[in-house]
Amino acid sequence: ISIFFFAGTVTFTPFFNTFFLSVQDYVMTNLDGAGFIGLENFKNLLHDATFIKAAKNSIVWTVANVGLQAFFGLVVALLLNMRFKGRGLFRALMFTPWAVGGMLVALIWSFMFNESVGVVGDVLNKLGIVDGKMSWFSNGTSAMWAMIIANTWRGIPFFAISILSSLQTISTDIYESASVDGAGAWTKFWKITLPLIKDTLLMTILLRTIWTLNVVDIIYSMTSGGP
């Protein structure tokens, strides 16, 4: 009971305090002049250009990050669940990015996206996708995608290890029975694998959504909050 009381106190007290302040005309330089104004602050917020832009960026950032991490994490988990020589080594190497701190991830990818010596721009040039040097951090769109790529690289291992642990609980007898019935690889995935890992996948998506919304280190280290 004491644990629930403590958790409730540290969770709900700040929430209600914040809501109480949000419905008042609260000015830091005039603490005694606060007065109740209802939902006026929320109305003003919805017409604030900076807030709207920040909200849009947050949605793009979260959806792109979680979507890419979920897709590639699932692919990696399926590959690592197969039997092949050196699987243990590949698993260890695959999970390395998750152990790297956000500041170091930002440093690595900032160097890779560097206009002069970055390997990303060089590869895109050789593939004919871009012509000449590309300054990734000179505009908001390319800077956003540079950060998304960096954070996706860091987050894929978490999806992979979560999904892989769920895949390993599925009995091979189910797949063998499906093969006897003539089911192909695609049918097995949609009818057996995906339904059985659905709960794990949804929980992982929920966790990564919360964590992605709270990412600060990569964003600030790569762009200092801009452009």
Predicted stretch roles:
Residues 1-227:
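A structural signal for multi-pass alpha-helical bundles of membrane permease subunits
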